[in-house]
A protein has these predicted regions:
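Polytopic transmembrane helical bundles with strong interfacial aromatic enrichment
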Residues: 1-163
């Protein structure tokens, strides 16, 4: 979004929208699997936890981004307003997901006095899977985002060629 505002190149707007689309998909999967995990671990699918609430609010903020984009007809105006929204939304997401949960009591590890995943907290059998997931999921997200971006570019070029 910053690159779009600096250059006005439509490719950067397309990358921003596909990053948001990919992020929302991962948000929904994260919320759904988190609810399953919470139900097993804490006995209810949605305990009043700052990290869960922050994740839901973050998802809603990016859904609002999509609503905003779809409400505007003119392409340049849509891209500019969406870029500004995206730039302001990102730091709020960081606060919602990382800063506030650390400052308040939470059921999640590392929050409100709960221990983090330290040497004694995670079994050695779980560590390889955990670290592989920490590397793999962002790589999968980047790959999906780049695929969606390339498809969007091809669709745009096809529209330019067709009368």
């Amino acid at each position: 979004s910053i690159k779009y505002l600096n250059t006005g190149k439509q490719e950067y707007d397309l990358m921003a929208i596909e990053a948001v689309n990919t992020g929302i998909t991962f948000c929904f999967f994260g919320l759904a699997t988190g609810m399953l995990w919470a139900n097993i671990t804490w006995g209810e699918p949605w305990p009043n936890d700052p990290k869960l609430n922050g994740s839901a609010i973050a998802t809603l903020m990016y859904l609002a981004y999509l609503v905003l984009r779809n409400a505007l007809e003119e392409e340049q105006k849509r891209a500019k307003i969406s870029a500004v929204y995206n730039i302001f939304a990102f730091p709020i997401i960081i606060v919602l997901l990382y800063i506030l949960p650390k400052m308040t009591d939470s059921l999640h590890p590392g929050s409100g006095g709960n221990a983090t995943f330290g040497q004694l907290q995670m079994s050695n059998e779980l560590r390889p899977t955990f670290y592989a997931a920490m590397i793999g999921w962002p790589m999968i997200a980047f790959w999906i985002c780049s695929l969606r971006y390339r498809v969007r570019l091809l669709e745009r070029k096809k529209q330019e060629v067709e009368p």
